[in-house]
Amino acid sequence: MAEGRGAGTGYASLTALGLAPGALALAIGAAFVAAFVRGLAGFGMAILLVPLLGLMVLPVEAVIVSNLLGLLIGLSSLRQTWEAADRSSALTIGGLAMIATPFGLGLLHAIDPAWARVLIALVAVLAFVLVLLPPRPDGHSPHRAEVAATGISAGLLTGFAGMPGPPVVPFYLRQAIPAARARASMLLVFLATSLASSVAGLAMGMAGARHALLAAVLFGPIWLGNRLGGMAFGRVSDRLWRWLVALLLAASGTVALVRLIP
């Protein structure tokens, strides 16, 4: 009887998630890989996770779950991130992004999905082009307009696509700062955008118990993948890390362009 009750409970859990066992296994695998990339590169979890989850749940739900997972994993390593980040720029960019995120969520509901894919593709390609530009000279201090544009666009993209990375990554990658500081600064910004999008989703009635349950189920592989990715980051040089980040941006741009093909 106990075994039967256990099987019934497991079935009920899958029913609550709305996923078949095979789909859930795929989601767990995707979460692990996406989190490993995040731990190594400092970003990329949403870029990989949202499209894959979008095959199993509605695109809006994939964005919501990805944002919830970004919040949970960001809080789990907040102390290390806070100590290593360039807090002056990260807090400004993160604050502006939090303000802009609800407007991105509004756009997600208002714009035609076909146009949404075009805009996301353009942003992803532009981010890769910016990374290829020459790095800033030593001692360069970003202009206020550059900081503001980075924060606002990151917030809009967080709400719109769950992808704050395209404007934030080039901003830090082109700065003459160590890879560890750039990575931590990006992670601090992404924690802010995850918090804003999660709160906005709840306030707008877009996030519910099902999304929280799916995020809770996926958090285990997310934590493990992020931990292993962070360990791998400690074994690569600054130069190699920057190339890996550029390649990840190129891959995201390619995927976004492929999705435009009918």
Where are these regions (language model features)?
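Small-residue-rich hydrophobic segments that form or flank transmembrane alpha-helices
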Residues: 17, 24-91, 151, 155, ...
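Residue-level recognition of pore/gate-forming positions within transmembrane alpha-helices
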Residues: 70, 97-101, 124-127, 190, ...
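Short, strongly hydrophobic alpha-helical membrane anchors
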Residues: 1-22
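A helix-boundary/kink motif common to multi-pass secondary transporters
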Residues: 58, 112, 178, 237-241
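Interfacial loop-to-transmembrane junctions
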Residues: 228-249
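Hydrophobic alpha-helical transmembrane segments in multi-pass integral membrane proteins
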Residues: 62, 107-108, 117, 157-163, ...
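Hydrophobic/aromatic positions within or immediately flanking transmembrane alpha-helices
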Residues: 63-66, 117-120, 183, 242-245
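Transmembrane helix exit motif
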Residues: 74-84, 105, 119-144, 230-231, ...
